[in-house]
Amino acid sequence: MTLTNYVQEVSLADFGKPFHHKAYWNKRLKTTGGRFFPKDGHLDFNPRMLEENGELIFRKIVRHELCHYHLYFEGRGYHHKDRDFKDLLAQVNGLRYVPTSSKSKTNHHYSCQTCGQVYQRKRRINLAKYVCGNCHGKLIEKNQS
Protein backbone atom coordinates (compact mmCIF):
# COMPACT_ATOMS: atom_id res chain seq x y z
CA MET A 1 0.00 0.00 0.00
CA THR A 2 1.41 3.39 -0.96
CA LEU A 3 1.40 6.38 1.37
CA THR A 4 -1.22 8.15 -0.76
CA ASN A 5 -3.49 5.09 -0.58
CA TYR A 6 -3.03 4.92 3.19
CA VAL A 7 -3.95 8.61 3.57
CA GLN A 8 -7.01 8.08 1.33
CA GLU A 9 -8.07 5.16 3.52
CA VAL A 10 -7.66 7.18 6.75
CA SER A 11 -9.55 10.10 5.22
CA LEU A 12 -12.54 7.96 4.28
CA ALA A 13 -12.57 5.98 7.53
CA ASP A 14 -12.05 8.85 9.99
CA PHE A 15 -13.49 11.88 8.15
CA GLY A 16 -15.94 10.32 5.70
CA LYS A 17 -14.41 12.50 2.97
CA PRO A 18 -12.13 11.62 0.06
CA PHE A 19 -8.50 12.71 -0.25
CA HIS A 20 -7.89 13.81 -3.86
CA HIS A 21 -4.22 14.81 -3.83
CA LYS A 22 -0.83 13.12 -3.26
CA ALA A 23 1.04 12.26 -0.08
CA TYR A 24 4.84 12.01 0.00
CA TRP A 25 7.58 10.95 2.40
CA ASN A 26 9.97 13.80 3.20
CA LYS A 27 13.19 12.70 4.93
CA ARG A 28 14.28 16.32 5.44
CA LEU A 29 11.60 16.88 8.09
CA LYS A 30 13.31 16.79 11.49
CA THR A 31 10.95 17.99 14.23
CA THR A 32 7.55 17.89 12.55
CA GLY A 33 5.34 14.93 11.75
CA GLY A 34 3.96 16.29 8.51
CA ARG A 35 3.08 19.34 6.44
CA PHE A 36 0.09 20.45 4.39
CA PHE A 37 0.65 22.59 1.29
CA PRO A 38 -2.43 24.71 0.48
CA LYS A 39 -0.98 25.82 -2.86
CA ASP A 40 -1.31 22.39 -4.47
CA GLY A 41 -2.98 20.34 -1.71
CA HIS A 42 -0.30 17.69 -1.20
CA LEU A 43 0.88 16.37 2.16
CA ASP A 44 4.43 15.57 3.33
CA PHE A 45 5.15 13.12 6.13
CA ASN A 46 8.25 12.39 8.19
CA PRO A 47 9.16 8.69 7.75
CA ARG A 48 10.94 8.63 11.14
CA MET A 49 7.63 9.23 12.92
CA LEU A 50 6.35 5.90 11.63
CA GLU A 51 9.64 4.09 12.41
CA GLU A 52 10.07 5.49 15.95
CA ASN A 53 6.45 5.74 17.13
CA GLY A 54 4.58 3.00 15.29
CA GLU A 55 1.47 2.90 13.16
CA LEU A 56 -0.99 4.08 15.84
CA ILE A 57 0.80 7.39 16.47
CA PHE A 58 1.48 7.84 12.75
CA ARG A 59 -2.25 7.48 12.01
CA LYS A 60 -2.92 10.31 14.48
CA ILE A 61 -0.32 12.45 12.67
CA VAL A 62 -2.09 11.71 9.37
CA ARG A 63 -5.39 12.77 10.97
CA HIS A 64 -3.78 16.04 12.05
CA GLU A 65 -2.65 16.85 8.51
CA LEU A 66 -6.01 15.78 7.09
CA CYS A 67 -7.70 18.27 9.44
CA HIS A 68 -5.68 21.03 7.76
CA TYR A 69 -6.50 19.56 4.35
CA HIS A 70 -10.29 19.19 4.72
CA LEU A 71 -10.82 22.49 6.54
CA TYR A 72 -8.83 24.38 3.91
CA PHE A 73 -10.90 23.00 1.04
CA GLU A 74 -14.13 23.66 2.95
CA GLY A 75 -13.10 27.31 3.36
CA ARG A 76 -12.98 27.08 7.17
CA GLY A 77 -10.18 27.95 9.60
CA TYR A 78 -7.36 25.44 9.04
CA HIS A 79 -4.59 27.00 11.15
CA HIS A 80 -3.63 25.65 14.58
CA LYS A 81 -5.10 28.73 16.28
CA ASP A 82 -8.56 28.36 14.70
CA ARG A 83 -11.48 26.94 16.67
CA ASP A 84 -12.64 24.86 13.65
CA PHE A 85 -9.25 23.14 13.55
CA LYS A 86 -9.15 22.44 17.29
CA ASP A 87 -12.69 21.05 17.30
CA LEU A 88 -12.15 18.76 14.30
CA LEU A 89 -8.82 17.52 15.67
CA ALA A 90 -10.47 16.60 18.98
CA GLN A 91 -13.37 14.95 17.14
CA VAL A 92 -11.12 12.62 15.11
CA ASN A 93 -8.63 12.05 17.98
CA GLY A 94 -5.60 13.46 16.16
CA LEU A 95 -2.34 14.57 17.74
CA ARG A 96 -1.75 18.25 18.45
CA TYR A 97 2.00 17.80 19.03
CA VAL A 98 4.45 15.20 17.77
CA PRO A 99 6.05 12.98 20.43
CA THR A 100 9.68 13.85 21.10
CA SER A 101 12.33 11.54 19.77
CA SER A 102 13.75 8.98 22.17
CA LYS A 103 17.20 9.31 20.63
CA SER A 104 19.72 11.40 22.53
CA LYS A 105 20.40 14.64 20.72
CA THR A 106 23.63 15.44 22.53
CA ASN A 107 26.71 14.21 20.76
CA HIS A 108 29.54 15.77 22.75
CA HIS A 109 30.03 15.58 26.50
CA TYR A 110 32.48 17.83 28.34
CA SER A 111 33.36 18.17 32.00
CA CYS A 112 35.36 20.65 34.03
CA GLN A 113 38.61 19.34 35.51
CA THR A 114 38.28 21.59 38.56
CA CYS A 115 34.64 21.50 39.69
CA GLY A 116 33.29 18.54 37.68
CA GLN A 117 30.49 20.51 35.97
CA VAL A 118 29.15 18.48 33.01
CA TYR A 119 28.22 20.07 29.66
CA GLN A 120 26.34 18.36 26.82
CA ARG A 121 26.48 19.87 23.34
CA LYS A 122 25.33 18.98 19.84
CA ARG A 123 28.36 20.66 18.29
CA ARG A 124 32.02 20.40 19.19
CA ILE A 125 33.55 23.29 21.09
CA ASN A 126 37.11 24.60 20.94
CA LEU A 127 38.63 23.47 24.26
CA ALA A 128 41.51 25.94 23.89
CA LYS A 129 39.04 28.83 23.69
CA TYR A 130 36.24 27.94 26.13
CA VAL A 131 36.39 27.36 29.90
CA CYS A 132 33.95 26.33 32.62
CA GLY A 133 31.22 28.89 33.30
CA ASN A 134 31.27 28.21 37.04
CA CYS A 135 34.93 28.26 38.00
CA HIS A 136 36.81 29.10 34.76
CA GLY A 137 38.53 25.72 34.93
CA LYS A 138 39.77 23.77 31.93
CA LEU A 139 37.24 21.59 30.05
CA ILE A 140 37.95 18.06 28.87
CA GLU A 141 35.93 15.92 26.48
CA LYS A 142 34.51 12.75 28.00
CA ASN A 143 34.81 9.51 26.01
CA GLN A 144 31.63 8.09 24.45
CA SER A 145 32.06 4.42 25.33
From Swiss-Prot:
GO terms of biological process kind: response to stress
Main location: cytoplasm
GO cellular component, one term: cytoplasm
Cofactor: Zn(2+)
Keyword Metal-binding attributed: yes
Cofactor note: Binds 1 zinc ion.
Entry keywords, A to Z: Cytoplasm, Metal-binding, Zinc
Annotated binding of Zn(2+), by residue: H64, H68
Catalytic residues (positions): E65
Molecular function GO labels: zinc ion binding
Location(s) in or outside the cell: Cytoplasm
Coiled coil: none
SMART domains xref list: SprT
Family, as annotated: Belongs to the SprT family.
Name this protein carries in UniProt: Protein SprT-like
Taxonomic source organism: Streptococcus pyogenes serotype M6 (strain ATCC BAA-946 / MGAS10394)
